[in-house]
Swiss-Prot record:
SUPFAM superfamilies: Ankyrin repeat, SOCS box-like. One of its GO terms (biological process) is intracellular signal transduction. Pfam families: Ank, Ank_2, SOCS_box. Keywords: ANK repeat, Cytoplasm, Repeat, Ubl conjugation pathway. The lineage of its organism: Eukaryota, Metazoa, Chordata, Craniata, Vertebrata. GO terms for cellular component: cytosol. Interacts with ELOB and TNFRSF1B. This is Ankyrin repeat and SOCS box protein 3.
Amino acid sequence: MDFTEAYADTCSTVGLAAREGNVKVLRKLLKKGRSVDVADNRGWMPIHEAAYHNSVECLQMLINADSSENYIKMKTFEGFCALHLAASQGHWKIVQILLEAGADPNATTLEETTPLFLAVENGQIDVLRLLLQHGANVNGSHSMCGWNSLHQASFQENAEIIKLLLRKGANKECQDDFGITPLFVAAQYGKLESLSILISSGANVNCQALDKATPLFIAAQEGHTKCVELLLSSGADPDLYCNEDSWQLPIHAAAQMGHTKILDLLIPLTNRACDTGLNKVSPVYSAVFGGHEDCLEILLRNGYSPDAQACLVFGFSSPVCMAFQKDCEFFGIVNILLKYGAQINELHLAYCLKYEKFSIFRYFLRKGCSLGPWNHIYEFVNHAIKAQAKYKEWLPHLLVAGFDPLILLCNSWIDSVSIDTLIFTLEFTNWKTLAPAVERMLSARASNAWILQQHIATVPSLTHLCRLEIRSSLKSERLRSDSYISQLPLPRSLHNYLLYEDVLRMYEVPELAAIQDG
C-alpha cells in the first residue's frame, strides 16, 4: 500500500477539518461526538493532520477531546507520531504544544528516525532547540543505519546546527553501522565548513571506517582538494593503510580517480615503501587501472618506478601488463611507461598475442624487447598457439628480429599449430640438424600431413644455410633494424635475402616495412 499519497475518500470528516484548519467545522463535529482517532489510508489520524498542516487551534481542540498520552503518541503506518510531522515541517508552536502535552521527544519511526533528526534534516534550528530543552537525546542512532543528527548536519553543512549539537554534548566520534563518523561524512562529500568545525572541536582526523578507509582516503578518492589540504594540515596520516591487505593509501585513490592536484599534495608526504615494496601495490598501478595518463606521468616524473612490483592483488606482473585491459587509453599509457624506462619482456609480448594487439607486438620488438633468454617461455608459447591463426601479423616480425625458432619447436607448438604455421617456423631453421626429440615430434606430425613430410625431406639450400650463418653472427638488436642490414657491404638482393624477403613473399606475408605501424 502507498503510504505517501493521501486518498481523500479515506480521510474522516474530523481529519479533513484538521487538515484544512477549519476550526468552526471541527468544533461542530466534536460536539456531535465524532471520533478523533479514525485513520486514513496512511494511518494518519486528525492529530497528525493538524500537526503537519500547522493547525494550532485544531490541535488544541483535538488534545482537549482526547487528552490521553496514548492519543498524542499515536503513530501512522510508517511509525510517525504528530511530533515527528510537526518537527519535520518546523512548526515550533505545534511542537511546543505536543511536548507540553506529553509527547515523547525521543519517539522513533519504523526506520528509527527521531523528531530531533527530522528537525536537523530540514534545517529547523528553532524546533531543534525546543526538542533539546525537553530532553531529546542528542546522541545515539537517529536512523536505521545508525546515521545520527550530527552525521546529517555535517552532510548538509549546516554550521549553526553542527555547533549547537556539539555544545549540547553530541559525540563527535559517533559511528554509523559502517563505522563512519561525522568528520568522515564531511570529508566524503566535500563539506569544508563542516570539516573545519569538527576538526576544531577535536574530532579525530585519522578515524577509520569498518573497511579501514580514512577521511583523507575518501576525500582523495572523491577529489575534494580543499578538504585534503585541511586534513593534511591538521595531522591526517597519508601512510595509514586503508584496507585489510595493508597496501591501499590515499595516494592510490587520487591516482586511480584522476585527481592530479591531490596527487601533487600527497606525493611528497607519502612513504615510498609503496613504490616497489614487497607485498605492496605501487600507485602507478592505480593510475594505469584508472586510465589516467596525467596521473601516471606525475608519478613517474616524481621518481616512481614504471616497473613497480609484481601485483598479486590485480594479477599482473607489471603496469605494462595491466595496461592491456585499458583499451581506450592503451597506447598513451604504454608510451608513457616506455618513456620513463619500463622494461619490456616476453610476458608483454604474450599479452599482445592474448589480446590480439599485433601492432603493439611489433612496436615492442622495435623498442628493444629482449628475445632471450626468457623466463616465461610456457606463457608465451601458450598465447602464441592461441594466436597462430593470425601468425602472419606477428610471427614473421619475431623471427626476422632474431628470435630463436627452436624455442617454439616444442611439443605443444608442433602438435597444435596449423601445418602452414609450422612449416613457416621451420623456414627459419636448418630443419636437417634439429635435435632428435624435435625430429621425432615432427615426424609424428608429418605422418598425416604430406606437405610437412615433403618439406622436412628436402635439404636446405646452401644459400639458406649461409643466411642462417650470417644472421647467427649478428645480435638481435641489429637484426631488428632494416637500416643496419642495408648498410652491410653486400648487394641489395642479399640484403633482402637476409631479411627473408623470399620466404615472406612465398607465404604472402606483407612486406615488414609496410606494416610497421605503432
